[in-house]
Amino acid sequence: MQISEVSYLGNLRTACKHLKSGDTFITDAPTDNNGKGEAFSPTDILATSLASCAMTIIGIYCNKNNISFENCEARVIKLMGNNPRKVDQIIIEMKLSENNWDDSTLEKVIKAARTCPVELTLKNNVQIEYKFT
């Protein structure tokens, strides 16, 4: 199923369009790889999608189980490797504490988050670490 279209704009930039919604965004190569770093790089999007996916799965889990889910923020840290240049590690620092869940609920929510499709796709190739607070 086609989901998007990507066009090269020149100067190491691309335009990405989501076909269903029409939403668009630009990517730019990072400064450490010949770009200007003026927008998300493709690997930034990869790393950020992990946090976004985990939050989405938490939301789905909470909706299905009648659990209030109001607050969540995450910091995304991406560590690159060389030879070949690739994402070696993604660290997600996810703040869930403002939801006031008991320990049992928090454990179940975290377990659900770790089943997100992005993590399941990446986990054998990229070191993934979560820090839940």
Predicted feature locations:
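Alpha-helical metal-binding/catalytic segments enriched in His/Glu/Asp
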Residues: C53-A54
